[in-house]
A protein has these predicted regions:
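N-terminal glycine-rich anion-binding loop in soluble enzyme alpha/beta folds
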Residues: 1-45
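Mixed-charge interfacial surface used for oligomerization/domain docking
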Residues: 1-14, 71-74, 78-83, 95, ...
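Structured helix-beta-strand junction loops
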Residues: 3, 37-38, 58-59, 65, ...
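Acidic/glycine-enriched edge-of-secondary-structure segments
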Residues: 29-47, 176-191
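N-terminal/domain-start segments enriched in small and hydrophobic, helix-friendly residues
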Residues: 31-32, 36-39, 49, 60, ...
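Short catalytic-loop micro-motif centered on adjacent basic/acidic residues
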Residues: 43, 64, 96, 213-214
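Rossmann-fold dehydrogenase core element
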Residues: 89-93
């Protein structure tokens, strides 16, 4: 964040009677503990236009990266705030990017933007190259727990119980439209991780030019294993590992892994 001067308009999460703000002060262990002990699905809320307006007033040349607009109202609120601020100060330069992704996908887009800025590209070039990057970016993830999908009604209880009983792990991905889809499935975490690593080769192109981002939710050992195997098998320019933040933790749940490249 310091290197690229990144600020955040945080989302919020409610689990039962507990309220969490997804910023740098988030109690991630507290969030995980609340999710484990609640029969209700976590409820997430996007920031309204207000937090974006506060940030827009601080800077004149701004790039914004949001969660997929198919998953959250964050993009729409960032755009509404842009319209409002331009009525106050029409000379501000604000570009809002829909990530068509989530979690480490957003991180990788911000990383790309930072690299382009440091490399000295002009604003139009940065926008063009970033839009191309988003269009080509792949997001894949493996869930260790189906609890939140079941609680949220995204997976029927019976189907979820059968999957859990047979230890079936879904390999999921982002569609070009920014929704979540089933890519593959495997019995057991180890097989699911192997499939996840295989999918990199099936979906990725020009990997020597790209950075692989790996986000994990309390699963550093698993993330390190994937990093090692991906380094052996593919020619990524760089591989980075990050911990999931709040919303990412809700998506991934404990043991979850998310890749973006």
């Amino acid at each position: 964040r310091e290197r690229f001067n990144i600020s955040t308009a945080p989302l919020s999460i409610d689990v039962g009677d507990k309220h969490f703000i997804d910023d740098e002060n988030l109690d991630r262990e507290g969030l995980l503990d609340s999710m484990r002990n609640s029969s209700d699905a976590p409820k997430t809320a996007s920031p309204g236009p207000g937090p974006f307006l506060d940030l827009y007033r601080k800077y004149d040349n701004i790039f914004v990266v949001t969660l997929s607009k198919e998953l959250s109202a964050t993009y729409q609120n960032a755009m509404l705030a842009k319209k409002m601020i331009l009525e106050e100060a029409e000379d501000k330069l604000i570009k809002v990017f829909n990530s068509f992704s989530a979690t480490v996908g957003e991180t990788m887009i911000a990383y790309k933007l930072g690299e382009l800025i440091e490399a000295g590209f002009n604003r139009d070039e940065i926008i063009e190259k970033t839009e191309k990057y988003i269009e080509e970016m792949q997001t894949l993830f493996v869930l260790d727990s189906l609890d939140n999908l079941i609680k949220a009604g995204r997976m029927g209880k019976l189907k979820g119980k059968i999957a859990s009983f047979f230890n079936i792990k879904p390999v999921l991905g982002a569609t070009p439209e920014g929704t979540i889809t089933l890519v593959d499935k495997a019995r057991g975490s180890k097989r699911a991780i192997r499939k996840l690593i295989e999918k990199i080769g099936e979906r990725g192109e020009n990997l020597e030019e790209k950075v692989l981002g790996i986000a994990h939710c309390n699963a550093l050992e698993k993330a390190e294993y994937i990093k090692g195997k991906a380094a052996e098998k593919y020619s990524f320019r760089e591989i980075i590992i990050v911990e999931t933040a709040g919303i990412s933790t809700v998506y991934a749940n404990e043991g979850g892994i998310v890749l973006a490249f």
